[in-house]
Amino acid sequence: MLLSILLQVATGTGLAKLGEALGAGLAVIGAGLGIGKIGESAMEGIARQPEAAGDIRMNMIIAAALVEGVSLFAVVVCGFLL
């Protein structure tokens, strides 16, 4: 077990997998922060102007979907880097 782990690190696949995991993790964290900021701004806008809640909600969902799509693409690319 330990020998196989050491051989993986020695050949470089261990470091590649570490980079893959770090890249995917950073992409997901960034997407989470971005979607949180979108939600925060939407709630502030709805609180200021309740009559525009439908339009604000629709724009919020579209923006969150775009951010989530970019995050999913980044995770897939990180998965195929090896």
Swiss-Prot record:
GO terms for cellular component: plasma membrane; proton-transporting ATP synthase complex; proton-transporting two-sector ATPase complex, proton-transporting domain. One of its GO terms (molecular function) is proton-transporting ATP synthase activity, rotational mechanism. It is found in: Cell inner membrane. The record marks E68 as: Reversibly protonated during proton transport. Coiled coil: none annotated. The keyword Ribosomal protein does not apply. It is a multi-pass membrane protein. This is ATP synthase subunit c. It comes from Azobacteroides pseudotrichonymphae genomovar. CFP2. The lineage of its organism: Bacteria, Pseudomonadati, Bacteroidota, Bacteroidia, Bacteroidales.
